[in-house]
C-alpha cells in the first residue's frame, strides 16, 4: 500500500479508534444501562475513571469472541509489530518475579488502561482470566489480584518458554506457555512447587502491542493442589472484614448480625460448582472480596452483598451444569479460551452417560471390570479405576465395552516403571528415552529433577547448556550465532556461543582455555 493510502488509512484508523468503532461493535455496556436479569455472556468490569470514581460496566464476551476474528493492519510492519509484541510477552510473563511496585508498573505499561486520554472508557478493557478460578477486570482490579502473586504468603517466579509461542491468524492472538515456580510459605508445610507449565491465551489491541485479554490455564496439578488447600472461612472472619471495609456508601448489610446470618448460610452451603473457585457461592469467594475490600471498598463491597453478588454466585449452574444427574459432578471445561467460564456435567466414576443421565456399571468381582493395563477395579458394586498412577475413569459406554475405561488425561502418555504402568505428562521422564526430544536430540537433553516439587514424582526433560529453551515438551532450539556441538567433557551436545568451548577442537586456534574447577572455557585467539 502506498504512502498516500497509508496516510489516509491511519487517519481513518485514528478517528475510528477515537469513536471506538473500527474493530467491530463496542463490547462495553454501562451497568446502569442494563436492566433485568444479567445473561451469562456479560462479565462485570470495575472501571476506575479519571476522577477516581468507580464505574461498573458489563463486557459482552460474545462480541469479543465473534467481532474480532479479522484485524488487518495494512500500514503496519507486521514483522516489527510481532517483534515488539514478543518483547512485551517476555516482560509480561515475568512481572511476578520482582516486587509489587514492578507488578503495578507492568500493568500500567503493558496492559490496556481503563480510560483513554480524553477520559472516555476504553473499548478494550483489560481482562485477566484464570480459567476455572476467576475473572478480573479492568486494569486496576487485575493488577490488584496480580499483587497476590508477590506477598508474604505466595511468590511466583515465571519465564516465557520462547519456542511455545504460536501466533494466530486473527492478527491479535497468541498462545504460549510459561514455566512457573511457586513458593507458598502461607500454606501448611510452606511448600516449594517448581516447574509447572501454565498456558496463556493473549489478545493484543489490534495493530498495537498493548495486552487486552490474558487468559491463563494453570497446570492441572496446581489447580488440584490449590483447591485442596483452600479452607472454609468462618462467617465471623468474613463479616469482621466487611464491617471494617464496607461503610458509608459502600455498606451492604444493615447490621453485623444480618451479615453473620447470611454468611453462616454461605459457609454451610455445599456448592455444586468445582472447588477452589472464586466464581462460586462459597466462603472462599466472599472472604477474598471481603479482604480485598479493605483496599478497594468501591470495587469489592458489591461482591459480598447478599443474594445478588456479581461474582460470588454458582455461575456453573447457568454455564453447563444446571441439569446434572445425581451421579454426576460439575467439571470445568479445560482448555477453554473463553472469557466466560464453561462447565459440563460428567458422570462420576462407576457410571456412564452424558452427564445429565448417568447409568451405573455394576460388578461383583474385578474380572467384570476389564481395562487396559489391568487398572480396572470393582468397589462397592461399581466398576472404577485403581487409585494411583494417574489413570482416570472415562464415563463412556463404548469405552467401557472396549476395555478402555481407565485412561490417562490429555497431554499424558502411558509409561512403565518397575513393571507397572503410569500416566506421565509429556515432557516429564524417568529415563531420557521417554522424552519427546529423544528421537532426534537424544544427546541434547537430560532427564533431571527440576527444582523442588513434591507433587511431581517425575524428572523433567531439560535441554543441555546454552539452548534457547528449557525443554519440557519442546525440541531444544539453538539460535545463531550459537552452534550445536558435541562436548567430550560433558558427554553431550551443547549449544555454545562462538567463543565458548569445552574441548580444544571447538576452537579455530585449537586452544580452549578453562579455569580450574570449571568445565566451560573460552577460545584463545
UniProtKB/Swiss-Prot annotation:
InterPro entries tied to this protein: EGF-like_dom
Gene3D superfamilies, A to Z: Laminin (2.10.25.10)
Glycosylation sites noted in the Swiss-Prot or TrEMBL record: 60, 77, 171, 181, 268, 281, 354, 411
Keyword Ligase attributed: no
Domain EGF-like intervals: 317-359
Cleaved signal peptide residues: 1-24
Keyword Glycoprotein: yes
Gene Ontology cellular-component annotations: extracellular region
UniProt keyword annotations, A-Z: Disulfide bond, EGF-like domain, Glycoprotein, Secreted, Signal
Primary localization class, coarse: secreted
Cell location: Secreted
Disulfide bridge partners, by residue number: 321-330, 324-345, 347-358
The organism's place on the tree of life at top rank: Viruses
Protein name stated in the entry: Putative EGF-like domain-containing protein R659
Amino acid at each position: 500500500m502506498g504512502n498516500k493510502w497509508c496516510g489516509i488509512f491511519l487517519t481513518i484508523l485514528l478517528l475510528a479508534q477515537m469513536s471506538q468503532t473500527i474493530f467491530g461493535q463496542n463490547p462495553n455496556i454501562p451497568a446502569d444501562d442494563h436492566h433485568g436479569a444479567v445473561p451469562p455472556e456479560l462479565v462485570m468490569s470495575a472501571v476506575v475513571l479519571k476522577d477516581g470514581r468507580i464505574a461498573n460496566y458489563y463486557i459482552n464476551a460474545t462480541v469479543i469472541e465473534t467481532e474480532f476474528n479479522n484485524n488487518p493492519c495494512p500500514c503496519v510492519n507486521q514483522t516489527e509489530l510481532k517483534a515488539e509484541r514478543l518483547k512485551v510477552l517476555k516482560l509480561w510473563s515475568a512481572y511476578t518475579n520482582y516486587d509489587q511496585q514492578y507488578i503495578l508498573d507492568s500493568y500500567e505499561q503493558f496492559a490496556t488502561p481503563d480510560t483513554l486520554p480524553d477520559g472516555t472508557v476504553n473499548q478494550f478493557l483489560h481482562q485477566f482470566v484464570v480459567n476455572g478460578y476467576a475473572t478480573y477486570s479492568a486494569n486496576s482490579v487485575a493488577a490488584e489480584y496480580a499483587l497476590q502473586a508477590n506477598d508474604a504468603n505466595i511468590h511466583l517466579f515465571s519465564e516465557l518458554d520462547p519456542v511455545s509461542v504460536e501466533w494466530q491468524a486473527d492478527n491479535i492472538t497468541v498462545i504460549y506457555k510459561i514455566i512457573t515456580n511457586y513458593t507458598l510459605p502461607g500454606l501448611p508445610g510452606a511448600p516449594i512447587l517448581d516447574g509447572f507449565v501454565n498456558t496463556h491465551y493473549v489478545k493484543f489491541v489490534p495493530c498495537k502491542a498493548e495486552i487486552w485479554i490474558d487468559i491463563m490455564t494453570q497446570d492441572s496439578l496446581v489447580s488440584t493442589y490449590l483447591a485442596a488447600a483452600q479452607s472454609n472461612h468462618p462467617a465471623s472472619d468474613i463479616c469482621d472484614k466487611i464491617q471494617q471495609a464496607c461503610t458509608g456508601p459502600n455498606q451492604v448489610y444493615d447490621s453485623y448480625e444480618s451479615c453473620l446470618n447470611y454468611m453462616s448460610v454461605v459457609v454451610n452451603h455445599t456448592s455444586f460448582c468445582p472447588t477452589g473457585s472464586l466464581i462460586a457461592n462459597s466462603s472462599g469467594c466472599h472472604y477474598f472480596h471481603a479482604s480485598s475490600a479493605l483496599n478497594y471498598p468501591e470495587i469489592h463491597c458489591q461482591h459480598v452483598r447478599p443474594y445478588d453478588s456479581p461474582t460470588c454466585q454458582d455461575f456453573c449452574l447457568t454455564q453447563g451444569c444446571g441439569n446434572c444427574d445425581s451421579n454426576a459432578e460439575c467439571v470445568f471445561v479445560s482448555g477453554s479460551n473463553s472469557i466466560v467460564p464453561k462447565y459440563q456435567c460428567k458422570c462420576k466414576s462407576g457410571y456412564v452417560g452424558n452427564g445429565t443421565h448417568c447409568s451405573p456399571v455394576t460388578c461383583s468381582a474385578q474380572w467384570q471390570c476389564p481395562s487396559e493395563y489391568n487398572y480396572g477395579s470393582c468397589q462397592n458394586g461399581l466398576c472404577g479405576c485403581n487409585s494411583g498412577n494417574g489413570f482416570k475413569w472415562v464415563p463412556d459406554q463404548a469405552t467401557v465395552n472396549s476395555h478402555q475405561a481407565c485412561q490417562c488425561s490429555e497431554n499424558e502418555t502411558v509409561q512403565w516403571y518397575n513393571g507397572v504402568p503410569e500416566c506421565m505428562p509429556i515432557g516429564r521422564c524417568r529415563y531420557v528415552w521417554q522424552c519427546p526430544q529423544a528421537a532426534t536430540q537424544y544427546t541434547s537433553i537430560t532427564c533431571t529433577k527440576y527444582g523442588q516439587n513434591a507433587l511431581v514424582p517425575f524428572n523433567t526433560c531439560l535441554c543441555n547448556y546454552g539452548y534457547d529453551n528449557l525443554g519440557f515438551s519442546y525440541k531444544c532450539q539453538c539460535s545463531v550465532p550459537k552452534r550445536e556441538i558435541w562436548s567430550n567433557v560433558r558427554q553431550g551436545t551443547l549449544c555454545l556461543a562462538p567463543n565458548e568451548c569445552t574441548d580444544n577442537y571447538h576452537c579455530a586456534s585449537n586452544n580452549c582455555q578453562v579455569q580450574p574447577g570449571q568445565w566451560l572455557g573460552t577460545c584463545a585467539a
